[in-house]
Regions:
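Acidic, glycine-rich active-site loops and adjacent beta-strand->loop/helix elements
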Residues: 29, 101, 133-134, 156
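Conserved active-site-proximal phosphate/metal-binding subdomains
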Residues: 107-129, 135-241
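Active-site entrance/lid segments in N-terminal catalytic domains of soluble metabolic enzymes
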Residues: 1-124
Length: 241
């Protein structure tokens, strides 16, 4: 819903119409065939009076001066202690520590939250919340027992009445078990946890056949630009998600 500065501005306006409470914006810095206009997005965030930004993917260091000068609190999502410490060193105010259980990109270290969260608690001097596999009150109690200040839910919020995604997607998430995810793009050092479907099966067959020779172009049909078709149209087999 926020691929361009104009779309983000529209979403901010909607949020302000619905609540007078604080809300944040996510900025994800990932490899892309057509990278978003990050400076433009940040300009809209600042002009919109947003005071909390969650960054993810690559380091937010390049954009920290603009965000901090605007009085914005930055929470960076990290999948390792070393990345968390780096985020702390560049001025992030808090960390979202993302365990291997998470949907999406879990990093390359494969460390689950039962190990990762206590390590973060031992090393970090700034607050952190737990991410990855968080879904209910049990998750929150466990996260806080392991040293987190709270938790961050992602996939869980897709399966809500308010989420602007197709009902097929919501049902697939609710009906999935712990055995229904797959890890893809490991050989490209861009690991992603996705829900199993025929498109993912095709992708994994390509990975198996090509091995170390696999390139992004070999799997582009399964991963590039598929989200609108899946999330909005409900075509569950359009690609990996």
């Amino acid at each position: 819903t926020q691929g361009t500065p104009e779309k983000l501005a529209n979403e901010l306006a909607k949020c302000k119409d619905m609540t007078d409470k604080p809300f944040g914006v996510n900025l994800t810095f990932l490899p892309s065939l057509t990278p978003p206009d990050y400076p433009g997005l940040i300009k809209v965030i600042i002009e919109g009076g947003v005071k909390i930004v969650e960054t993810a993917g690559r380091s937010p260091a390049e954009y920290m001066p603009a965000l901090k000068d605007a009085g914005i609190k930055v929470i960076h999502k990290c999948t390792s202690v070393r990345h968390s410490l780096k985020a702390q060193s560049v001025g992030c105010d808090a960390i979202s520590v993302d365990g291997f259980e998470c949907g999406g990109h879990p990093g390359e270290d494969d460390i689950p939250n039962f190990i990762l969260l206590p390590r973060a608690a031992d090393e970090l001097e700034i607050p952190f919340v737990a991410s990855g596999g968080m879904a209910d009150a049990r998750s929150l109690v466990a996260a806080m027992a392991l040293g987190a200040e709270g938790m961050n839910m992602g996939t869980r919020f897709i399966a809500t009445e308010e989420a602007p995604v197709h009902e097929n997607v919501k049902k697939a998430i609710v009906n999935a078990s712990e055995l229904d995810t797959r890890l893809i793009m490991r050989s490209l050092t861009n690991t992603e946890r996705v829900l199993a479907n025929p498109a993912v099966d095709r992708l994994m067959e390509k990975e198996k056949a090509l091995g170390d020779k696999l390139t992004f172009s070999d799997i582009v049909d399964e991963v590039a630009g598929v989200y609108p078709t899946i999330m909005m149209d409900g075509d569950m087999d359009a690609g990996a998600w």
